[in-house]
Amino acid sequence: SDNIPELLYYPVSRDELEIHLEGGIHPGGRKWVHLSKTITNAANAGAVHHFHPAIIEIDIIQMQAAGNTVFHAGTTVYLTETVDAQFCVQVPYDNTEYTLMLGEWGEEE
């Protein structure tokens, strides 16, 4: 768990936000759940699949304390098997980093 940030982020469609906040994050068709180092990284990754994705913040310290493993897989990408709902909170839509991303997306549309 060396050099793993205390918080990581996961993008979801706004329609699926509550499902993930209540049921956690699972890999679906992938082997791993892919987490991002920053809100901006997660927003950019999510924007490929979702219009203005919501971002979930994951408490990695608590997750690791509960016995979950997180791997560093790339410059800004981290992997884990699953994320329990207790470690997930929504990044508010008025978060500064998130609103900057919305501004960039607005210019592209």
Q: Which role does the model predict for each range below?
A:
Residues S1-E109:
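Conserved NAD+-utilizing ADP-ribose enzyme module
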